[in-house]
Amino acid sequence: MLTINSTIKKFIAIMISTMLLLAVYFSKESEAVENQIEFKEMVINGDVGHEDKKLIREVNPNYRNIQSWISSVGAAVAINDINGDGFSNDLCMVDPRFNNVTVQSLIGEYEKFQLESTTKQTIAPMGCVPADINEDGRQDIVVYYWGRSPLAFIQKETSDPLSSESFQPKEIVENIEMYSNTLTFSDIDGDGHLDMVVGNYFPDASEVLNKNSVKKPLMQDSMSQALNGGTNRIYLWSEDQGDYLYKDVSSQVPDELLNGWTLGIGVADLNKDGLPDIYAANDFGPDRLLLNKSQPGNIDFTSLTGKKDWKTPRSEILGLDSFKGMGVEFVDLNRDGWLDILVSNIAEEYALMESHFAFINTGEWEQAEKGIAPFENQSVELGLNKSSWGWDIKSGDFNNDGKNEVIQATGFIRGEKEKWHELQELATINDELLKYPNSWPKFIPGTDISGKTENAFFIQNTKGRYGNYSDVFGSSEKKVGRGIAIADVNGDGLLDFALANQWDQSSFYLNKSKVTGNFIGVDIAYSTYLNQDSLKIKEGKDSTKKRHAVGASLEVYLPNNEILLAEVDGGSGHSGKRSHEIHFGIGDIKKKKYPARIKWRDVNGVLQEKNIEVTPGWQTIWLPMEKGEK
């Protein structure tokens, strides 16, 4: 017995020493980088002259003792080319202080204006997504809400300069009382048209924002396995829907996607079969990954989960996790030609000590036949596991050095009275009581839970590990962030971004970095108005009316054997929506042309692939409208 105890003690001592050495090593590694990325911060939603601003929502009486918790979402931002000048310099944002949706030019091309807003206090916009849903070559805007179904604002033919009169509100689905926190577009069934995926939070008809309601809506029924949330929905584009543009096919959705408390939805082709797969980031329960096997008009998904092994806790296995999923991002972090998945959770250094995820795609997709998701969480090894209370997460190469940075919006409720300890107690409550709001601590105005943290900006060092350099945000005032939108606003090859803050002013960050590398930038669109029958590449930006090829992918092959991969994004994430362009930083590599392969679905739904060459700088790839070349 003494020998066993002695052996155990030695083993424990060795393990502790090893962990301490690793901690020192990792901390040194994360510091070994010189930050040369600089931004100029500009406020995009000032409150001067607005006496009607609010800092809390009116809520259902059953939620009054957790009013600040219920009021913690709604700030959102999107950057895109809405006015069709060829540059993604238009910004759409939701400001919960005024319960409105506004559109503005980041370069002053037109006056800031408000989209027609609801006058009902029981309805609140949660985000806006630019998309050409009627396929006329002009960007429309789809707004999603708490309290109703998504509503489209269709851009009219004569809309120069842009104004509120440029958009016509249109119901595109049957209007019901639903509570959406995220929405994205992609061609789910492969028919050549954009479909809509909506992530919902509260159950339908909960009357969350009705201060006079007699209903008694509930909260989650578990902190780790909650399945009593809102019903997520998939809407397919349809020509025969009468008054509506989209058909609700949610009855065909697997149960795994349906009723989590969803805060983030991501859609991308993870296995390279030409169909976009779905990742749902769920609060209070396991995230979900659905492998897409759909055919035109008929959706078909298979749920995948990560493989269990001795070194990975169940709480960090894809599809089995118990963390608080907030945002999701697809990026090929290791440049091996496979899209990886970044996920925001709650990852403070204390209290609810969870972890963010960096699921690295192994490319072993034959495992999917056994229901296994071929991903390994490497957030700890990469240094991406900790920051704060995470929301939107986005990635891009902001100094074009060939290594992607990662931005994360963080923070929960800002106030004067620290309530972390009460939240910690709530996390241990019996699940049978958790769903009843009156059993919760009081989270009312004045509450502070992770309200004084800094948004995260992760930069990778030469050893491959990331360190958090939040000083790039500039402002000394700490705010709680929600949505992030990335775009090259002025076409200089440097990525800029906007960050929407909850109950506060939000900011746009213009990239002013001086030490930068080379880049490849590509705008992929259908040649709706060029009448061409083959793929063509035009140097630079192009203001010709275009229908962006959402879901199209581009692989670029570098002489150092790295493979660059990205897709045209249709709105993945939490409440931030990036522009439709693809951007790669390539460091100091200098060649006139780079071999590449583009994959897309033509407007008839036929999957196309073509070997091409791309050049440094911006270029526009015009896709043929009919069946293209291989």
List the predicted regions and their residue ranges.
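Gly/Ser/Thr/Pro-enriched helix-cap/hinge segments flanking short amphipathic alpha-helices
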Residues: L2-S68, S72-A76, Y110, W365, ...
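Short loop/turn motifs that recur once per blade in beta-propeller domains
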Residues: E38-L55, N65-W69, F113-I123, Q168-Y179, ...
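Surface-exposed loop and edge beta-strand positions of immunoglobulin-like domains
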Residues: N80, V94, A131, Y144, ...
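Beta-propeller blade repeat segments, especially FG-GAP/WD-type strand-to-loop junctions
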Residues: N99-L115, S149-P169, V208-M223, N228-V249, ...
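Repeat-solenoid scaffold signature
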Residues: M178-T184, V197, S322-K417, K479-T516, ...
